[in-house]
Amino acid sequence: MMRTLITTHPLLLLLLLQQLLQPVQLQEVDTDFDSPDDEMEELEEYLEEFQSTGPTRPPTKENVERRVIIEPGMPLYDRDYCNEEIKRKNVYHKYRCVTEHYFLLMQYDELQKICYNRFVPCKNGVRKCNRSKGLVEGVYCNLTEALEIPGCEYKSFYRTGYVLITCAWQNEIHKLIPHTINDLVEPPKHRSFLNEDGVFVIPP
């Protein structure tokens, strides 16, 4: 019940809880109703992120799995894929819609391994990204309407390509973990991504 309410009416639930919790602190919320601990933890995470005025918290495996990794089910080429999945997975930044997002049909462990691949230019040409060695299926979501939830509307683009990601070091586990999905680059037909030295390059 709690998960259904969170995924279908996130803004309404957050506004209601803000009124109920003032001036009570979040840790003082009465949790004597029937709700699994993990669902309460997820709700608290949403509230903390929405109300925070500081920098965005570093990514975790759980966040990446929840927001990026998808399972076979709804056809990836469905025109409403992004609208449905972004609402279902609560992919927002504070009270605003994200301008773009990627969903990837792969396992988290496979995505994490990309962090140890060689560097390539990101799509903006400024930063360095890590590229997958093989092609990955996914969906690119581009915001077309609204800036604040729940009015986010997206156009969906099915892609099969090389994943470009940035990674961050996590001290707790002493490993690199995926930070952001930078792009899903579709290879041009009959054209190699390797130059004469065997180094991967992004075509202009």
Swiss-Prot record:
The keyword Ribonucleoprotein does not apply. Glycans are attached at N130, N142. It comes from the Eukaryota. Coiled coil: none annotated. The keyword Disulfide bond applies. Disulfide bonds join C97-C152, C115-C167, C122-C129. It holds the Pfam family RnaseA. GO terms for molecular function: nucleic acid binding. Does not exhibit any ribonuclease activity. Belongs to the pancreatic ribonuclease family. This is Inactive ribonuclease-like protein 9. It comes from Chlorocebus aethiops (Green monkey). The lineage of its organism: Eukaryota, Metazoa, Chordata, Craniata, Vertebrata. The gene is RNASE9.
